Amino acid sequence: MEMTNAQRLILSNQYKMMTMLDPANAERYRRLQTIIERGYGLQMRELDREFGELKEETCRTIIDIMEMYHALHVSWSNLQDQQSIDERRVTFLGFDAATEARYLGYVRFMVNVEGRYTHFDAGTHGFYAQTPMWEKYQRMLNVWHACPRQYHLSANEINQIINA
């Protein structure tokens, strides 16, 4: 992240104020203030993650993924024979924190801040799937979008989606 000295000074002052406003996280803010003041390039890259950007198209895709899981669970709940499909297979897992952190952050934002999909079970890890999921979800979306009744899926359609 490239910043002018004036921008670094402003951000440093912001971190200084945050140490006073949020004592529970004061140590973290002091560390970030030191990094900014001294211009430690390697550590300043951490700020890129904090100030990252998620394109509108990606946000819409993540919402589409969450909506697909909502439809899967509703459809599964309406099945006569729910035993044929394990409920865990139609439960949204989330994303991998190591490789998909921005996606994971957006899911948490949507649920915890925006109040959408609050019925999803975050588990003990808060939608941390512990394995990369993006490509799997893309395959699932392709199958789901091809279904004529996306919110009234048959057991066969549910299986096709979750096995994509």
Curated annotation (Swiss-Prot):
Q: Which InterPro entries match?
A: UPF0304_YfbU, YfbU_alpha-helical_sf, YfbU_helix-hairpin_sf
Recorded hits in Pfam families, A to Z, give:
YfbU
Which Gene3D superfamilies does the protein's record reference?
Helix hairpin bin (1.10.287.680), yfbu gene product, domain 2 (1.10.3190.10)
Family indicated by similarity:
Belongs to the UPF0304 family.
* This protein's name: UPF0304 protein YfbU
**Organism whose genome encodes this protein:** Shigella flexneri serotype 5b (strain 8401)
